[in-house]
Amino acid sequence: MDDAVAAGTREVIENHDFMSWLGMELVEFEEGRAVLSIPHDEKLTNIVEGSRGTIHGGVTATLVDTASGFALRTTFDDPLEPALTTTDLDVTYLRPARSDLRAVAEVVRAGGSMGYTDVKVYGTAPDGEQKAVVKGSASYRLFRDRAGRSETDGDR
């Protein structure tokens, strides 16, 4: 991906209220792959006794979904104007997340109308080693013939 596309993608994240509230950042953006991060923040953690201080599972699920979408954006002619939507999201929690998160999403297949990704979300274990805290996959409907158009634009 060229620098202008990566910069435009970073701007999408910065201007998206939810993504920016999470502190999400684009780390890497290349053909078939996107790496996103979210810093550990108390506002994102569970408050239930026994889980206190661990990042809420919805945050990691969001990271799986968003990283998948950005990885699939790289398969469009214009990654800044894609039309796509999640059709299936699978998230498996491997261990509690208690640190900054880093999601690595890779495109498994991107056809004319469907795209599939595999994702791993990493956190830092108490011993300092990076370990997978979540593994996930996603399926997306790709609207290649309608890139840049909203669902309300109707069929043309």
Regions found by a protein language model. Give the residues of each.
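N-terminal leader/capping segments at the start of a protein or of a new domain
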Residues: M1-E28
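A generic structural signal for short beta-strands and their flanking turns/coil linkers
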Residues: S20, G32-A34, T85-L89, S99-L101, ...
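Catalytic strand-loop segment that frames the active site of acyl-thioester-processing enzymes
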Residues: G23-T54
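Beta-strand residues in well-ordered beta-sheet regions across diverse protein folds
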Residues: S37-P39, V104, D118
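Compact, glycine-rich, soluble single-domain proteins
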Residues: G50-D65, G69
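Hydrophobic beta-strand-centered segment that forms part of the acyl-chain substrate-binding groove
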Residues: G69-V104
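HotDog/MaoC-like acyl-thioester-processing domains
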Residues: P96-S99, V108-R156
